[in-house]
């Protein structure tokens, strides 16, 4: 209990050190800050715990979730004071998308999974499918799944046909509308969120003696730009913008989106995390109608056939990036 208490205090201290500002985002890329405080474009992929990939050969995928946002809301704010005067500005952006039915989303998820397995196999990995994993580690079959098409942090979550949907850290949290990288309480919640699949995946891998992989793909209908949130800009402007296009969404730090987690068989619970930081966006047309409805700035109606084609294209570009990370650190 004492150790647990110390860990919680440490997490709280770390969370409190996260700046209470939202980073500037440009076309889906969250800008980071360099050594001197200047804004810099992040690398395509952030990888933590690279050493965990070493020696990987026989692997199993415990979680493969594809999330489809149905709406997005961003807020940009700035405020400041000088000479006794105070200024503030705010910009709100709300978008929605309809027109893509469940069957289309299921096909996209199915194809994404098949593509990922094929890419792993081509890269020299032996992929243990879910039924065999349950035989090797019976506990896997006892996990409590969520209903397919459940609503989570990034909209509608879909598992490939024949697989179960399991929550991953942050999936049930509400997104921060400011696009913040993140506020302290959100940071603490993310770090202490331990769904069953996340907590038990390393043990299942240990019992089955396979490396274990968990993937979350976020397939959005556009990318966003925001000036973020700042309390240091007197007379500053706030802006938020939207560029349509089927996209494998990126994230950064705690506000991550498309990710891959990996644990080697004898990981001791220490694994690797790869986070996509540069989105993969298609310029292919997919919108049949676009308008403004009430408080919504962009109400998009998608052509499901065109959306599916564009989604397959960007997924086929995004997934190899994760396989490459695994190979580069093998």
Ranges and model annotations:
Residues 9-15:
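Hydrophobic helical h-region of N-terminal Sec-dependent signal peptides
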Residues 1-8:
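Bacterial N-terminal signal peptides that target proteins for export
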Residues 23-128, 132-170, 174, 182-247, ...:
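A structural "domain/chain start" motif
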Residues 17-19:
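N-terminal signal peptide c-region/cleavage motif recognized by signal peptidases
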